[in-house]
Amino acid sequence: MAAIYFHVPFCKQACHYCNFHFSTSLKHKNPILYAMLTELKLRKAELPNNEEIKSIYFGGGTPSLLTPAEVMGLINEAKRNFNVAADAEITLEMNPDDDRPNYLEELKAVGVNRLSIGIQSFHEEELKLMNRAHNAQEAFDVLDRIQGLYDNFSLDLIFGLPNSTPEYWQKNVE
């Protein structure tokens, strides 16, 4: 299956468990977006036989720091340069604290049809230990909003944090 992955290497803050390359400064966001658009054009000839793209994935970092217009620009450029399936899964990773008025609706309108929510835990103590920017209530709130808008979504939970108990994990899963 052919797919396109966009790595968005920006975060609001550093989470204590993360080993990925990222920056907490957005000053290079526009040059990196331009580089991604250029890369799509350069890689066009590398896909054999005009193979169909079944998935576009925005990972990070924190792709939800992009505006819907920026996401749309990357999706549209991918469609201009590749044979993107009409029913392609287009996923964007998102942190609960990045939800803002109309954001989820605008992402859906530009073609995002799946969200992956980086909740990590529903327990305040664990969120603080991980240095997450959101709180438990924001996690519940974004899940409530997503369920009314998206048929397809996933969420991340971290198992085995220091001082975590089986009861904490069970409550997270429930």
Where are these regions (language model features)?
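Alpha/beta-hydrolase
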Residues: 6-8, 119
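Extreme N-terminal starter segment of soluble prokaryotic enzymes
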Residues: 1-4
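Local cysteine-cluster metal-coordination motifs and their immediate loop/turn environment
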Residues: 9-20
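Conserved non-cysteine loop/helix-boundary elements of the Radical SAM core domain that shape
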Residues: 22-174
